[in-house]
């Protein structure tokens, strides 16, 4: 009995010794890892933030904060054009690097971190295999052809008119009075969500006027906080830690996944009843050239989810940013208002085509807003393939990630003089090669945004309609901000601008 009691009393001591030994070995391992990454690692020669050179958790922290795009820019200001932003990652901020990494023929593929985002099956966002991606993109391209986009315009116009009608409540004020302040970020979120839902699924969720489905938009934003962290540090999923750290994001993801599942199911059920084609119908009817296969239900759902998120957010952020900069730049605002109002004699004339394309200053304002406040401003990481790659004159061996911080290169003064100045005229010079060479709000090359043409049409039509109908201004007395700030959580989380509107009266006929 005494021996048993002695063993029981000594057990905690033995456990403590074991834990101490294990902790010592673990500490020694961490110390060795830090020394290796700082001194002996193949990328040790490159400067960068100290914590970033040691651990991916540095980037993950800034992704969680939503300022990773600005932090990459700050690091470039301190360390130069090439920085080691994570132990196995190099970031650049030059036009040459944009071409080297994202241009056609670059010896890179999507980073392995995108595997972390795969849910059921890979989609065009997460596919790493170049051949598979090219095949899927060919299937999807039919839904974004010029002919398809032209056929979608009436639906887009109808929803834009709904937004314009809601910006000023009729009879709420005299013609010459300013409206109540409107936070435009949610308005543009509702508009673009309704547009993409209509164009993809022929669905009418009417978030512009009804609360019911607005929770889906909030769920997307919440879900993307976790996604942005995983893209920087997949290790966060170890022991399912992300489930505890990002419980709200998980709830948002589940809510959005259920929405997509039910929406796709409803869309499939009514396939034979639709008179007009939508993007989903193009996906259903298109087949891969290689084997004649069309997309299955999981693939259709995955692509639809990506399009809803990317298609809604990119355009909403573009619209909000452009309105912000116009409201802060009186001279430019008056010039673009004059351009739009002289170009169109009536609201009915505002359509996609040569007349709208003639509004060159309006288009330049959109491009400049995308330059200053890109919807996704951090780096799109690419893994170097066998044989390595030379980026901006520096050779990077196989297996490491390279990328260009979009916000950082968009604010590089060697490409864009006075980069924090809203200057749409930089896009109106005869030769725009230099400014275009580093411009990548929609990415570049084979991985560029497939819906770029649709997004540009939406932005031009929306802004032209608003400007033709209304004067607008920032709320008097508000603080003047030099830049439209975004939180980079894969997509751009945003607030504002808060604007007031006033109807334009033409020949005693009220517009609005």
UniProtKB/Swiss-Prot annotation:
The lineage of its organism: Eukaryota, Fungi, Dikarya, Ascomycota, Pezizomycotina. Its EC number is 1.-.-.-. GO terms for molecular function: heme binding; iron ion binding; monooxygenase activity; oxidoreductase activity, acting on paired donors, with incorporation or reduction of molecular oxygen. The gene is poxM. InterPro entries: Cyt_P450, Cyt_P450_CS, Cyt_P450_E_grp-I, Cyt_P450_sf, Cytochrome_P450_monoxygenase. It is an enzyme of class 1 (oxidoreductase). Keywords: Heme, Iron, Membrane, Metal-binding, Monooxygenase, Oxidoreductase, Transmembrane, Transmembrane helix. Pathway: Secondary metabolite biosynthesis. It comes from Penicillium oxalicum (strain 114-2 / CGMCC 5302) (Penicillium decumbens). One of its GO terms (biological process) is mycotoxin biosynthetic process. This is Cytochrome P450 monooxygenase poxM. It is a single-pass membrane protein. One of its GO terms (cellular component) is membrane. The keyword Aminoacyl-tRNA synthetase does not apply. Belongs to the cytochrome P450 family.
């Amino acid at each position: 009995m005494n021996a048993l009691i002695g063993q029981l009393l000594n057990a905690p001591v033995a456990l403590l010794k074991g834990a101490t030994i294990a902790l010592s070995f673990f500490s020694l391992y961490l110390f060795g890892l830090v020394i290796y990454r700082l001194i002996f690692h193949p990328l040790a020669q490159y400067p960068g933030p100290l914590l970033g050179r040691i651990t991916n958790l540095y980037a993950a922290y800034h992704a969680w904060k939503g300022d990773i795009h600005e932090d990459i820019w700050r690091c470039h200001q301190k360390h130069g054009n090439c920085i080691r932003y994570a132990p196995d990652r190099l970031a650049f901020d030059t036009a040459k690097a944009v071409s080297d990494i994202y241009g056609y023929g670059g010896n890179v593929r999507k980073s392995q971190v995108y595997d972390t985002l795969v849910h059921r099956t890979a989609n065009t966002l997460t596919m790493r295999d170049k051949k598979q991606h090219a095949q899927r993109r060919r299937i999807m391209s039919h839904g974004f052809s010029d002919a398809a986009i032209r056929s979608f315009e009436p639906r887009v116009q109808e929803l834009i008119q709904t937004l314009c009608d809601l910006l000023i409540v009729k009879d709420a004020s005299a013609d010459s009075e300013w409206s109540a302040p409107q936070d435009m970020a949610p308005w543009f979120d509702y508009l673009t969500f309704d547009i993409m839902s209509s164009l993809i699924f022929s669905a009418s969720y009417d978030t512009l006027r009804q609360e019911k489905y607005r929770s889906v938009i909030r769920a997307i934003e919440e879900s993307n906080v976790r996604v942005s962290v995983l893209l920087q540090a997949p290790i966060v999923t170890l022991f399912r830690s992300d489930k505890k750290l990002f419980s709200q994001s998980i709830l948002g993801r589940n809510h959005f996944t259920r929405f997509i599942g039910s929406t796709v199911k409803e869309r499939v059920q009514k396939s034979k009843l639709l008179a007009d084609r939508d993007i989903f119908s193009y996906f259903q009817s298109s087949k891969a050239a290689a084997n004649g296969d069309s997309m299955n239900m999981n693939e259709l759902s995955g692509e639809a989810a990506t399009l809803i998120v990317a298609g809604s957010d990119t355009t909403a952020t573009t619209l909000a940013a452009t309105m912000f900069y116009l409201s802060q730049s009186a001279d430019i605002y008056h010039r673009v208002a004059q351009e739009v109002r002289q170009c169109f004699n009536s609201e009915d004339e505002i359509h996609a085509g040569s007349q709208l394309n003639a509004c060159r200053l309006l288009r330049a304002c959109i491009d400049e807003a995308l330059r200053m406040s890109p919807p996704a401003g951090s780096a799109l990481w690419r893994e170097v393939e066998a044989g390595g790659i030379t980026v901006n004159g520096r050779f990077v061996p196989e297996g490491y990630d390279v990328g260009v911080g979009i916000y950082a290169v968009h604010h590089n003064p060697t490409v864009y003089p006075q980069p924090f100045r809203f200057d749409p005229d930089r896009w109106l010079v005869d030769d725009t090669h230099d400014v275009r060479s580093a411009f990548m709000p929609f990415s570049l090359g084979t991985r560029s945004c497939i819906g770029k043409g649709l997004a540009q049409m939406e932005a031009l039509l929306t802004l032209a309609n608003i400007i033709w109908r209304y004067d607008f201004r920032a709320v008097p007395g508000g603080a003047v901000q030099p830049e439209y700030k975004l939180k980079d959580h894969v997509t751009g989380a945003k607030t504002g601008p808060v604007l007031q509107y006033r109807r334009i009266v033409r020949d005693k006929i009220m517009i609005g």
